[in-house]
Design a protein with these regions (language model features):
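Enriched for short, Lys/Arg-rich terminal
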Residues: 3-4, 12, 23, 38, ...
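Solvent-exposed, charged helical/coil patches
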Residues: 1-31
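Amphipathic alpha-helical interaction segments
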Residues: 18-21, 49, 70-71
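A short, surface-exposed loop/turn module that caps and links secondary-structure elements
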Residues: 28-55
């Protein structure tokens, strides 16, 4: 079982979502990720991954793996803000690795 750690930024983003169905689906995906089932995801950089949730406007959750057991959810967004969200996730990852 994986340990999931949520960044403060991710928590704020998640609970600010107006689409309750999307929030529910994202939380379900996080629960499945605890068991190692990340569903539809894509590796974006060496240690940055994008979990894709196909509901509403197409939500994305950006995360990194630290070791074999700890997963950190960095930030989230939808398809319209994808480029900006990836830049933000990379910046957060860089800060974590210092």
């Amino acid at each position: 079982m994986n340990e999931i750690v949520l960044s403060e930024e991710f928590i704020i983003w998640l609970y600010a979502l107006k689409n309750i169905q999307a929030r529910k689906k994202i939380l379900q995906r996080i629960e499945r990720a605890k068991d190692g089932n990340f569903g539809d995801y894509k590796q974006l950089a060496d240690n940055l991954f994008e979990m894709r949730i196909f509901v509403g406007s197409g939500y994305r959750v950006y995360y990194t793996k630290q070791g074999n057991i700890l997963y950190l959810l960095l930030t989230g967004g939808d398809k319209s803000s994808q480029s900006k969200d990836i830049e933000r996730a990379l910046k957060m990852l860089e800060e974590m690795e210092k």
